[in-house]
Amino acid sequence: MLLYNVTVGIDKDKEQEWLDYMTNKHIRDVMNTGLFVQSKLYKVLHDQEDGTISYSVQYFAKNIEDVQQYLEVFAPVLIEEHRKKFVNRHIAFRTLLEEVKFDG
């Protein structure tokens, strides 16, 4: 299992608008690609001194090919839509993680 994690810092005064957009549109658009099997949204529980609130948006994929297809075919348009809607009001970084299985 792979985890494509997007951590977003959003200005406090745009937080509710951003949450509405993410939960009603963006996350659904990503999931509707059919390339991820599950998504989760977490709020980061520490105060930011720069006036932002941080969230982790997590998308789970079965294999690297699905993630690569998403990044090549769908991500450019979806990222640009998000950027335009919240221009100069957010920062985002993306991380791809592979599950490490162990006993315990």
Q: What is the predicted function of each stretch?
A:
Residues 15-40, 78-80:
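Short amphipathic alpha-helical segments
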Residues 40-50, 81-104:
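Glycine-rich beta-strand-turn "strand-cap" elements at beta-sheet edges
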Residues 3-9, 42-73:
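Short, well-ordered beta-strand segments in beta-rich or mixed alpha/beta enzyme
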Residues 35, 72-75, 83, 87:
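A generic structural signal for secondary-structure junctions
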Residues 15-17, 48, 66-68, 103-104:
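Intrinsically disordered, low-complexity acidic/polar segments
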Residues 32-33, 62, 103-104:
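A short, structured loop/turn motif at beta-sheet edges
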